[in-house]
Amino acid sequence: MTFEDDLQASVRTIPDYPKPGVMFRDITTLLGDARAFRRAVDQLVHPWAGSKIDKVAGIEARGFILGGAVAHQLSAGFVPIRKKGKLPHQTVRMAYALEYGTDEMEMHVDAIAKGERVILVDDLIATGGTAEGAVKLLRQIGADVVAACFIIDLPDLGGAAKLHAMDVPVRTLMAFGGH
């Protein structure tokens, strides 16, 4: 069994959630398996081990779990990217595309200094709307977005390709067809 097969086996798939025709990939089972969680984090950070990474930015909410672990492994700071209205200090905000409409995300205006090297982390990339918004937000405040990392890629939905088109290298650990 390959590493990817092993990781895929630790992800629960829930059909028709949150709506009919969607195969929901639930990583809580991977997070609850100490060995799978450790291996996933180790593989996410592997390309940057020994590199100068200043901050890891995690997208709410599962990106906080993974991003915190990745930041720890890289001896980097952690920056939460949150839904609008959830942060107590002065923020910078960016609108992003959802499947039906738009929303806004924000981060503290002083969370990242201009030129700091940042890795973006979330659990899954599908259409890429949220990740694209996060990259734009990070660049708006002057971050050097080194890469974006995800446990799961849904390549049929084109999100990773969208980030590649923005000159952001993408690291994923496994892919599932469909959506």
Swiss-Prot record:
Q: Which reaction does it catalyse?
A: AMP + diphosphate = 5-phospho-alpha-D-ribose 1-diphosphate + adenine
**Any idea what this protein is called?**
Adenine phosphoribosyltransferase
Per the similarity annotation, which family is this? Answer: Belongs to the purine/pyrimidine phosphoribosyltransferase family.
Please provide, in alphabetical order, the Gene Ontology terms of the cellular component aspect for this entry: cytoplasm
**Biological role:** Catalyzes a salvage reaction resulting in the formation of AMP, that is energically less costly than de novo synthesis.
Quaternary context: Homodimer.
Name the UniProt key words of this record, in alphabetical order. Answer: Cytoplasm, Glycosyltransferase, Purine salvage, Transferase
Q: CDD domains given for it?
A: PRTases_typeI (cd06223)
User: Which GO BP terms, alphabetically?
Assistant: adenine salvage; AMP salvage; purine ribonucleoside salvage
Which GO MF terms does the UniProt record name? Answer: adenine binding; adenine phosphoribosyltransferase activity; AMP binding
Q: What class of enzyme is it?
A: transferase
Q: Which PROSITE patterns match?
A: PUR_PYR_PR_TRANSFER (PS00103)
- This protein's source sits in the domain of life called Bacteria
Cellular compartments annotated: Cytoplasm
Q: Tell me which stretches of the chain form a coiled coil.
A: none
Tell me which EC number(s) this protein carries: 2.4.2.7
Metabolic or biological pathway: Purine metabolism; AMP biosynthesis via salvage pathway; AMP from adenine: step 1/1
